[in-house]
Amino acid sequence: MFTSKSNSVSPSPSLEQADADALDISTKVQLYGVLWKRPFGRSSAKWSRRFFIIKESFLLYYSESERKSFETNKYFNIHPKGVIPLGGCLVEAREEPSMPYAMKISHQDFHGNVLLAAESEFEQTQWLEMLQESGKVTWKNAQLGEAMIKSLEAQGLQLAKEKQEYLDKLMEETEELCLQREQREELERLNQVLEAEKQQFEEVVQELRVEQEQIKRELELTARCLKGVEQEKKELRHLTESLQHTLEELSIEKKKTLEMLEEDKNQPQPLTNQSEQPPASDGLHSNLRQIEERMQELLAEKLLAEKRMKENEERSRALEEEREFYSSQSQALQNSLQELTAEKQQAERELKAEVKVRMDLERRLREAEAALRSLEQGLNSKVRNKEKEERMRADVSHLKRFFEECIRNAELEAKMPVIMKNSVYIHKAATRRIKSCRFHRRRSSTSWNDMKPSQSFMTSQLEANNIEELKEVAKRLSRDQRFRESIYHIMATQPGASALPRGGK
């Protein structure tokens, strides 16, 4: 019943490429072939063969003989037997008693249905697909498509504009973030410098404390030396008094001896005693010489003691000056420690304030980034509602406030590193001042090293031996009874000795 070949139903793209290029654009069709058609408008079971062409959104049909002319001339007849508009039509497959591969075309404006039939299932599927695709092309769809294209173009322009604005803001934000990052790196570097200065400051404070302890020990040593010098002064004073008393006694004894010699010289002696007198006179003269020698020794010892007392006085004054010097240095170190402690506390307060400000800026920056991301999501979203628009306006207001605050704080942000540098320079100047003070103190203290009475007095073995020897000589002279006994014995052997008092005892 249907003797068409397999190529009787073929789309125009299946033609050779050269032939397709030679055709006019108006002759290009989507699909052509021979189908069975039942009459329109009246009920009839008769099916007839027709040559059908799908051109754009229209179905044209001719007599079967037109197929040969179309394939030969490569263009279709503009006077078909009928034209069926496919726009908005519903195309579906169905089965008829004699045609298992039938197709129904219906539309609300048609006064009936159009029934077509193919020879095979493959051909039915091919025609159904093309008829359904052609039915989508309508005037309304064309107008809607144009309106949608214009709307999409307008939205694209708006989105491109908003995207450009967003990119500009993103670039500004990126520059701001880079600036914030650079300032944070600068702050971290300054923090490292401050940590190093803080450690150096603590080392300087520790050195000052050690020096203060050393000065304290030197003050204690000076005080002990002063106490020892005072004790020696007392002992030397006592020794001098003892020597003076001994000299006075020897002077009295010398005077008495001289009186005895004078009396013995003036007293007439018997002739029988003249032979005995020269020895007695010689003994008195010998004793007198011994007394004078002893007095010379005592005078020398007294002069030595007075010299030692004078040296002790000078050493006492030097120790007193040394103690005053160490006291002033200790007070200066204490003042330096107090100043350094105050500067350290001030620097720590400034650093804490800077860290607090930096944390607040970072928090506001994170909030601005969140608002920027929310604004980006709102701009990229295709669905707009009142809630999203309110949220976008709130994000824009938040970003505006953030940038205004950035502008207001720009000058302060620029000055913050300078403030931190100044704090570092203050610590460096304080360190230099302390080192200079310590250098001058050491320089001035070196002049005292050669004349420290405490060290020389306590460590000189020769001077210590001289003091001990002086003490022993003084004690020996003040307690020398043999000399006195010899004097009293000589005086007792002389005439009139019983009348002399025992002053030595």
Swiss-Prot record:
Polar residues composition bias: residue spans: 267-278
Modification Omega-N-methylarginine, positions: 502
What's the protein name?
A: Pleckstrin homology domain-containing family D member 1
Which keywords annotate this record?
Answer: Coiled coil, Methylation
Q: Give every PH domain span.
A: 28-136
Q: Name one Pfam family in it.
A: PH
Q: Which family does it belong to?
A: Belongs to the PLEKHD1 family.
Q: Give the matching Gene3D superfamilies.
A: Pleckstrin-homology domain (PH domain)/Phosphotyrosine-binding domain (PTB) (2.30.29.30)
Which segments carry the region annotation Disordered? 264-284
Coiled-coil portions: 146-391
Q: Tell me the InterPro entries matching this sequence.
A: PH-like_dom_sf, PH_domain
